[in-house]
Amino acid sequence: MSVFARATSLFSRAARTRAADEAARSRSRWVTLVFLAVLQLLIAVDVTVVNIALPAIRDSFHVDTRQLTWVVTGYTVVGGGLLMVGGRIADLFGRRRTLLFGAFLFGASSLAAGLAPNLELLVLARFGQGAGEALSLPAAMSLIACSSRTAPFQGVERLASVASVGLVLGFLLSGVITQLFSWRWIFLINIPLVSLVLVAVLLLVKKDETTARNPVDLPGALLFTAAPLLLIFGVNELGEDEPRLPLAVGSLLAAAVCAAAFVAVERRTAHPLVPLTFFGNRVRLVANGATVLLSAALSTSFFLLTMHLQEERDLSPIEAGLSFLPLGLSLILACVLVRGLIERIGTTGAAVLGMALAGPRHRLFALLPSDNSLLTSVFPGMILLLRMATGLVALQNAALHAVTEADAGVASGVQRCADQLGGASGIAVYVSIGFSPHLGGDWDPFTVAYSLAGIGLIAAVLAVLALSPDRRLAAPREQED
């Protein structure tokens, strides 16, 4: 063989080797993305999967509706409160290591939730699931963003799409599993899937170097999480048939102390969890405040409709889960359509329109008789949630008002915390007051809770409209224009 032919053969073989290596790396990235998407799906499913199972959990532990709210709020409060620090921990200890620990904690807590002998241990397990979410989700999103050198945000967008599917899928899975097996399996089913994710991460994700140079503001994160937990506990205690007033008042005072201490810590620490100057922008402040109120109404609607369909309408868990599918699809539809609406009438117009139209609908929904048909139970809910989701997406855009590259991560983290903590606090406060014999009076508990949620929506609309015209909500794209 000539020297030229031999050289050509070597070059050809090297090219094939490089192509094979690149194909193998591409397959590895896709497999990694799939398994990380499975983890995101589990986290998203766990937000809604407990809804249909709530009556079964209540009957299993013989607790009332007010105590039942902890099963939902425990997960979202801890997850939302620690989410801000999750990304910093991933930078400090490495994304791979943080993801492994967070996923393991989520899986172990799912096992504890499925085997919980009483409500107290179930709530503690839900706390653990929330902490696992707060650690694993930012690490997973960071790994996916870094896995593609050409389009890092495409993976993150796919992850967001998976989350939307998970929210809808949670309703259906909850109904099927609760009726055919047991409510415990809505948690136990996570274990084999989390195990697959752990094995995939160990085999496919390379060890990464730590990138953080600044310490984690752990005191700020703990105070930020403790304040809403103490608030919820105090309100729930006030709603008891025989409330322990010293404990309730002490919890509410402790919540106020934690909130004040959080502000003090953030002022003094060199590397705050949330720089207080971030809230100097009134538009961002109003957008996040309105998000809290809107998420409170949205989560309360899901909670109350679950109880209404299975208690008042006497639907089976599967039937209730199927009834929720149109509601979940209306949320996805709103996310698709709201972009065009924002381009036509602006972020302020979309936010106000969504919330203002949802407020009266919330009041009408509260007045539906208990013997109304399934169509009149679900269809108004579809319209209500479609409008509320429109307002929520518009507020999410406004929460990024005037953000720079340096504080973009803080802005998105604060917005997500406002969403999760608002939803948890809304369920706790509105439902506790509505179903309390002392606070709700002789009114129908559903009517009271829905009405309080509607009042919150009206307050959010007024807050947005109170901004001066030059400070009206604007999405990042509108600012550039």
Curated annotation (Swiss-Prot):
It is a multi-pass membrane protein. Proton-dependent transporter. May mediate the efflux of lincomycin. Pfam families: MFS_1. One of its GO terms (cellular component) is plasma membrane. It comes from the Bacteria. Keywords: Antibiotic resistance, Cell membrane, Membrane, Transmembrane, Transmembrane helix, Transport. Belongs to the major facilitator superfamily. TCR/Tet family. The gene is lmrA. Its main location: membrane. It is found in: Cell membrane. The keyword Nuclease does not apply. GO terms for molecular function: transmembrane transporter activity. This is Lincomycin resistance protein.
